[in-house]
């Protein structure tokens, strides 16, 4: 079989995903030998109760499984093994990760400029953006803000359509969606799936998990993969699923939504709810029975008399030996053996690096300027603290008794002011979420993000440092003059930028805000402690604290430069009469342990080098996760599978859990059930 140009056929065979347990317990199977395929012009719906493995299957197909799970089996695209992350396929996650300060039109426009070919004119890109807005039904909310913690935004259905719009801009041949109708009302859910129907009709392959669709939504699906407990209950054409359930002895009643019936047959939560209701009634009436519960609730559903585990096991067994399974296996084999046109691995973006840098910097700057919690609140706090510092150290003077006051003021500026950068960690975490989503979908590269993040934050850091330095220098009466003011500002800018680079590096490795704040606060605390203010450099323990910590400490170099900038060339009054004034250079050397012969610009250069080092480390961490981690995980998977496959508990299937119940009969022969098949 040969594929049409641009079409993507995806097939998976014997897909098993497990969470290894190297102790005495059994290994947990998230997926167990699942087979299936997705084709152009068709929507494949992956259905099942919560915990059935829907999201796990999508993550396995898209190459986004967590690091603590291992996968076996084959995933083939047009007959070849290939990775489907970083732009090869689009993936709309269940969580709508968006920049809440942008409008709908701005979000789509920036994404279009980041990814569409550079040869397109601005007018052509604008036409594509407007067409996408129209196709997704976003005209009414196109100029409204998406919304965040302080801005009211668009509805959940509009956010979901926007998430889909961002991924279909470049017309990907393969689209994955994780529960796109979750949390939506029936009308919004139908509209979203109708959009997917239109996308599939244009020759695209759409694979979507869905929890419990309405009858109207279910009718839009071409194929159905029904999962329960990580196993396949049914795979084939969606319209044939009702017939299979009827042939298996569990026909769908005429007035019931087919998807509701399918989930009722395989969802064990119904048994748990029934058992809980019976137990609660027995507390007041010891003779209360399950039959009485059915009578009091007026239910005529014969499924209530049969444990769900038995129904599920029967369906799984009957599907494996059914004609539906044989037909699906033949189709999967046909798709897996495709020859001819093989889709080349391509990037999700088709524009050049410099345009991406400009657009991404502009978008990030706008986001920072509109988010009050990113920089504006911190700038306000910095101004208030600067006024407090200025009033406490007001006109500190040049008396010998004020030498330590000058050092304390400089230490506070270099220490606590940089420590305040941790206040923006929540914004860093949110930005990293957006980056992770866009990077996995191939919107842009790691290098352009690393540089653009630095460039977009600089104007706010400069404003922050200018306001802080202007207030403190004027009120404390530090050395006046353009060069001293310029150095003071530049020293503070470099120190704060270095800390923010460190925070971004931490945000790239920690999973949540709390862990990031703990690590960031601990790290900055160590840097402040060894910066040379709380204990001067000559008094620091030589092992570890002096060498090497103080030499790789941005705070130590920034504080040295600040002391030199203030004290060199200044004379302090002597404590004794007729004794010459003390030079600032002498105080630097004898009291603070700082070599005055070393240029303050050298200290600033070292801070800049540490800043660059943090940015390179940030880049290296992101690249490691992208390039090296998959290789390490592949080796881990091979070794883990070879280990757990030797265990009898892994090879042995879970025993039938409900032997105490009587053997059930076909529901079509039971009284009170009206099946549309008869």
Swiss-Prot record:
Broad class of the protein's primary localization: membrane
Amino acids binding ATP: 48-55
Residue ranges of the TM segments: 374-394, 409-429, 446-466, 490-510, 513-533, 602-622
Biological process according to GO: cutin transport; petal epidermis patterning; response to salt stress
Species per Swiss-Prot/TrEMBL record: Arabidopsis thaliana
InterPro entries for the chain: AAA+_ATPase, ABC2_TM, ABC_transporter-like_ATP-bd, ABC_transporter-like_CS, ABCG_dom, P-loop_NTPase, Plant_ABCG
Key words of the record: ATP-binding, Membrane, Nucleotide-binding, Phosphoprotein, Transmembrane, Transmembrane helix, Transport
Pfam families noted in UniProt: ABC2_membrane, ABC2_membrane_7, ABC_tran
Lineage of source species: Eukaryota, Viridiplantae, Streptophyta, Embryophyta, Tracheophyta
Residue ranges occupied by any ABC transmembrane type-2 domain in the UniProt entry: 355-567
Membrane topology listed for this record: Multi-pass membrane protein
Name of this protein: ABC transporter G family member 13
Subcellular location: Membrane
Modified residues (Phosphoserine): 658
PANTHER family found in the cross-reference section: ABC TRANSPORTER G FAMILY MEMBER 11, ABC TRANSPORTER G FAMILY MEMBER 13
ABC transporter domain sequence ranges: 10-254
